[in-house]
UniProtKB/Swiss-Prot annotation:
The gene is slx8. It comes from Schizosaccharomyces pombe (strain 972 / ATCC 24843) (Fission yeast). It catalyses: S-ubiquitinyl-[E2 ubiquitin-conjugating enzyme]-L-cysteine + [acceptor protein]-L-lysine = [E2 ubiquitin-conjugating enzyme]-L-cysteine + N(6)-ubiquitinyl-[acceptor protein]-L-lysine. The keyword Nucleus applies. Pathway: Protein modification; protein ubiquitination. It comes from the Eukaryota. This is E3 ubiquitin-protein ligase complex slx8-rfp subunit slx8.
Length: 269
């Protein structure tokens, strides 16, 4: 076995060709790098975007093992948290200003609507003050529309002849409604026509066949039909047993044959 001084010489000779620095050389290189960074201007940290000062960063003078790394250019965690809070506070006023702009626009729109409603009211008052007659006429027309027949009981019997009532016509024209029948006959004798009863019955038309009724029959609601037409229209079910004119419920047993009644009255006379 060779002496100890020869073994050390062989180790130094093996490490020399590969230029492997010793631990003291690595520590010296690390200290030199730290000194160069301290003397150079402060760089921005990659994490939070804020500059790191020399006081906020603790640089070790060296390392004790090869696995330890140098925490270069890193700020303490507390400083990074404060910086992130400041960044959030800087963004809040921008969002709040946007909300304020939206609220102001909504309030502006509401003011426009109120102004438009006020303008409509003013126009209506101006129209009524300058043209009250036209406004009252329009209201009268609306009332007349609502006064038209709206229920079955208000329906007009179109199968019957409307009797001429001169007094009603005079009243509508604004004359004295207390005019007697004698005065009306003197004023308009041509409009007074006497029609025989036979001719009146012949003028009736069945609304189903649109012809002169055969076996003239009448429903309880006062409408005239042919006896065959009305019985065929009523049928045998409750759904169809309705008057073809006013749609009231009519049972076939309630249909009155007028010709039979007229014949019996003639025999009695």
């Amino acid at each position: 076995m060779p002496p100890a001084h020869k073994r050390d010489t062989n180790v130094r000779n093996l490490s020399a060709p590969y230029n492997i620095p010793s631990q003291s050389a690595r520590v010296a290189a690390g200290n030199a790098a730290i000194n160069r960074r301290r003397s150079s201007p402060v760089e921005n940290s990659p994490g939070n975007g804020f500059p790191v000062s020399e006081d906020a960063t603790d640089y070790p003078s060296g390392t004790t093992s090869e696995n330890e790394s140098l925490p270069l250019n890193r700020a303490p965690r507390s400083l990074r948290e404060v910086a992130s809070e400041l960044a959030q506070e800087e963004t809040l006023p921008v969002e709040t200003s946007d909300l304020n702009i939206d609220v102001e626009s909504e309030v502006f729109d509401l003011e426009d609507i109120n102004f438009q409603n006020d303008a409509d009211d003013i126009n209506q008052r101006f129209t009524y003050n300058n043209h009250p007659a036209s406004v009252e006429n329009s209201l009268t027309n609306v009332n007349s529309i609502h006064a038209q027949p709206t229920t079955i009981s208000d329906m007009i019997d179109l199968t019957d002849e409307t009797s001429y009532d001169p007094r009603k016509q005079k009243f509508e024209q604004g004359k004295n409604p207390s005019t007697t029948n004698a005065e009306i006959e003197k004023e308009e004798p041509s409009k007074k026509q006497v029609v025989p009863s036979s001719q009146r019955l012949a003028d009736y038309k069945c609304v189903i066949c649109l012809d002169s009724p055969e076996n003239l029959s009448c429903t309880p609601c006062g409408h005239i039909f042919c006896n065959f037409c009305i019985l065929s229209a009523l049928g045998t079910t409750a759904a169809t047993q309705k008057c073809p004119v006013c749609r009231r419920k009519v049972h076939p047993n309630k249909v009155i044959c007028l010709e039979m009644m007229l014949g019996s009255q003639k025999k009695k006379s």
